[in-house]
Design a protein with these regions (language model features):
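Acidic, polar-rich low-complexity tracts and alpha-helical solenoid repeat scaffolds
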Residues: 20-121
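Bacterial N-terminal signal peptides
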Residues: 7-16
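Positively charged n-region of N-terminal signal peptides that target proteins for export
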Residues: 1-4
Length: 121
């Protein structure tokens, strides 16, 4: 009887708990830091906005790109990543330089590879 209870009640309950835990880790916590410069998702968003308003530098964008790629590696299902990566590709292209164009192409390839179903292309 004890084996019956374990097999039919405890094992499915364990599966439900693990599934729920995975569902909660879909989004990155706002206070978790990514990349070499330790940027949170909110800081990345704010820096992208600042770069759109004030202008971007290649070095600053590369720091944000590294943080986004680190974020995507840890939370690949986070829906905040694809729109930010798209904006990064636009910012890199806006630099109008060989390095900027190459990095913009890298961002677009990253989107196609990691988020093929996104509307951000």
């Amino acid at each position: 009887m004890k084996q019956f209870v374990t097999l039919f009640f405890v094992v499915p309950l364990t599966f439900v708990c693990v599934t729920n835990a995975q569902a909660h880790t879909r989004l990155a916590p706002a206070d978790e830091n990514f990349g070499r410069f330790g940027m949170s998702p909110l800081e990345i968003t704010n820096r992208i906005h600042d770069a759109q308003v004030r202008g971007a530098s290649y070095r600053g964008l590369m720091g944000m790109q590294g943080a986004i790629e680190d974020w995507a590696a840890k939370y690949p299902l986070d829906p905040w990543i694809a729109p930010r990566e798209y904006l990064m590709s636009r910012l890199f292209a806006g630099l109008r330089s060989h390095d900027g164009n190459a990095e913009a192409a890298h961002c677009r390839a990253f989107l196609r590879t990691h988020y093929p179903r996104t509307r951000y292309k």
